């Protein structure tokens, strides 16, 4: 039977984590819109964001910008009178690139933002990362950081696999992942890049936690998570 202390710890975890997640969204939403909009305008003028939501990547595959524009503009164009907490929960957005790009350009011309709509989800975790990062380093800088994070997560996973079951197994896992997928194009689709970083880093973390007993079956489970 679980002790009272363990029950209390789990209860605190179950209550505390959602509150922490909400607090992070509120903090991201509190960043003034103009810091994000100036960066988006610069990216549009530099050709880093276009009206079409889908483009062709370096590897020749289709790059999904649809979700990217929606997530980068979460919290932008909030209706007047909406407080920060309500805005964070309801997650207003300018939408996909077809609507977000013209809206940003209209704002740059001195017009008011219109056309935002509610993009409610359980938790817009990508907005927690994208909104402050875009405001700080711009879209191009965010893509560079995404590429670095992807490389680091992939290296961490392959290193843990090599330590557990050998370099051949790590190669058999890494080669298909890196050479036969659109991995190289992921920084051009930031939402998918974040998801891949979490997946790879999570699998590497799993192998680190069980490093004393990691065998082929454990590595297979970690690979399946990818």
Task: Name each model-derived stretch.
Residues 169-174, 205-226:
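Short hydrophobic alpha-helices at membrane interfaces in multi-pass membrane enzymes
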Residues 128-146:
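Juxtamembrane segments of multi-pass membrane glycosylation machinery
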Residues 147-168:
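Transmembrane-helix motifs of polytopic, lipid-linked glycan transferases
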Residues 123, 177-213:
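Membrane-interface micro-motifs in multi-pass membrane enzymes
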């Amino acid at each position: 039977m679980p002790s009272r202390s363990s029950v209390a710890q789990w209860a605190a975890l179950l209550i505390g984590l959602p509150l922490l997640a909400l607090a992070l969204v509120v903090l991201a939403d509190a960043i003034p819109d103009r810091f994000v909009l100036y960066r988006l305008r610069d990216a549009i003028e530099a050709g880093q964001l276009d009206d079409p939501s889908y483009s062709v990547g370096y590897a020749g595959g289709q790059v999904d910008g649809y979700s990217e524009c929606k997530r980068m503009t979460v919290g932008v164009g909030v209706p007047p009178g909406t407080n920060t907490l309500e805005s964070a929960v309801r997650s207003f957005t300018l939408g996909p690139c077809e609507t977000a790009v013209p809206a940003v350009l209209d704002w740059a011309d001195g017009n008011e933002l219109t056309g935002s709509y509610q993009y409610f989800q359980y938790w817009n975790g990508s907005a927690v990362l994208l909104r402050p990062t875009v405001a700080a380093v711009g879209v191009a800088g965010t893509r560079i950081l995404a590429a670095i994070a992807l490389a680091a997560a992939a290296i961490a996973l392959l290193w843990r696999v090599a330590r557990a079951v050998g370099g051949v197994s790590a190669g058999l896992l890494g080669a298909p992942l890196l050479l036969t997928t659109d991995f190289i194009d992921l920084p051009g689709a930031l939402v998918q890049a974040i998801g891949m970083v979490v997946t790879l880093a999570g699998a590497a973390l799993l192998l680190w936690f069980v490093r004393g007993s990691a065998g082929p079956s454990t590595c297979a489970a970690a690979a399946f998570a990818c």
